[in-house]
Amino acid sequence: MTITARPRETELLAAATRLFRERGFHATSMQDLAEALGMNRGSLYHYITSKDELLWSVLNRSFDLLDERVAPQLDADAPPLERLRSAIHEHLRVAADHADELSLIQIELRSLSPERRRQMIERRDAYEHRWRRAIADGIANGELRSVDVRLAGIGILSVCNWFTQWYRPNGELTVDEVADAFVGLFLGGMQPWGKAPETDR
């Protein structure tokens, strides 16, 4: 299945994303997917060859969203601290807009077949590398203290990725308020003593 899908394929991706998050990949059957779409199970195979292919398509779409919206913030021609601040905000906005898709990266990537899992791990690693590069650039130009780049990247992304598990749009905080708090906690903690990062507010 291609990511630029026809309407019926788009409906299938949406149904699979919802059911995989609600029930888990292994507990969701092809019959469940067919019933969610109001079609016969056999008709699903006009669009996909297997459930594994469907999960792969969903995860590919998740990484496409991050590459389209967050990667440009990290790769921008701007000071490293500004790149990181903007990327935290945009990652959380993507997570809020596409919570089901992004949560599946964390909980179902391991469910893919070995070759497809390898492909997704490569995409995940490439995305994480962008964050580490921005952190390293910040250390190099003096905006950030000399910290362990790998651990700093893991810390920021772990908290940003877990956001999909607890954030509620009708809760007390807006997405940008949460992002500002994360900027203060992480970027503030990595800056030279006595400095504080700017927020979007």
Annotated model-derived regions:
Residues 57, 71-100, 152-156:
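Hydrophobic alpha-helical connector segments
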Residues 64-67, 115-140, 150-154, 177:
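Amphipathic alpha-helical packing segments from all-alpha helical-bundle domains
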Residues 90-93, 97, 129-140, 159, ...:
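C-terminal peripheral helix-coil segments that are non-catalytic and often amphipathic
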Residues 103-106, 147, 197-199:
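Short, hydrophobic secondary-structure boundary micro-motifs
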Residues 83, 96-115, 165:
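Amphipathic alpha-helical segments used for helix-helix packing
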